[in-house]
Amino acid sequence: MSEVKAVATRDSYGNALKALGEKAENLVVLDADLAGATKTSVFMKAFPDRHIDCGIAEANMTGIAAGLSTCGFVPFVSTFAMFASGRAYEQVRNAIGYPHLNVKIAATHAGISVGEDGATHQCNEDLALMREIPGMVVINPSDDVEAKAAVEAAYNYYGPVYMRFGRAACPVINDTPDYKFEIGKGITLREGKDVAIIATGIEVAYALEAAELLAADGIEATVINIHTIKPLDKELVVAAAKATGKVVTVEEHSTIGGLGSAVAECLCDEYPCKVTRIGVNDVFGESGPAGELIKKYGLDGQSIYEKVKASL
C-alpha cells in the first residue's frame, strides 16, 4: 500500500487532467463556476486557453461540450454529481448519449461523504441515472491511483463516459506494481470461500477492513473492486457467486439502481443466489462530518462486517 495515507479523488481528477493535458492537445475542460471545488483549477492554471468556465449553467455547459466533441476536441465536463446527473440530465441524455458523442462527464462531490453540504448536494442517485443511458460508460474509482488511471482510460475511449469522484480523502489501496486499470474489468483484491464482497468507489477500502474483521472470526471473504459499474464485469461477478454462493454488494449510493442492482440483475440472469445490498437505503442524507455520516448510514468497515455476518 502507498505511503500516501489518503487523497480525495477530486484532487486526483485535477492532477490527472493536468498530466493528460501536457500530451493531449485536443483535451478541453469545461466547468460551471466550480473550478476550485472540482480541482479543474489545476488544469486551468496550466492551460488557460483550453479551460472554459461556463458559469452556473450546467445544461448549457453540456451542450457546449457536445458541440466541441463534433469538432475534434475531447471535452471533460466538470461539476458536482448532483448537477451533472440531475440538473443537466436531459442534455446528458439527448445531447451526448443519444448521438453517442465523445464527451467525458466528471462528477465530483458524490455520495453522502460530501458531508456538511447536506442532502441537497449529497447525490446518491447518480450511478442509477447514468447507468440507464444507452451506451454510457459509468466509472466509480476507489482511490487516487484508480482515479488517475480512469481519467486517462476515459480519454482514450471513444464515447460518453461518466466518472464519479469524491470530496473526502480516502485511503490509497491500488499503489502496487501490478495494478492495471481496464474499463469493464473488475479487480479481485482478496480471495475467500465463504462470501464475496463486491464493492465500488470509496467503499472498497471499507470492504477490505470488513474482510479483516471477518477473517478474525474464521470467515474467509473474497473482496472485489468493481470500478466500472457499466459495462459490468459479469464474468467476474458470476465466478465469485459460483465460488462462494453468497454475494454482498457495498456502495456509497442508493441501494436502488447502482452497483447492487447491477450485480443482482446479472446474477438473476446468470447464476441466481443470495445477494445482500449495502448502501443508502432509500433515504435522503443529512449534514454532518463525512466520517460520521459513513458510520450513521452503515457504510464503514465495522458496519459492513456486521451486515455480512448477519447475511450468512
How should these model regions be labeled?
Residues 1-164, 169, ...:
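Thiamine diphosphate
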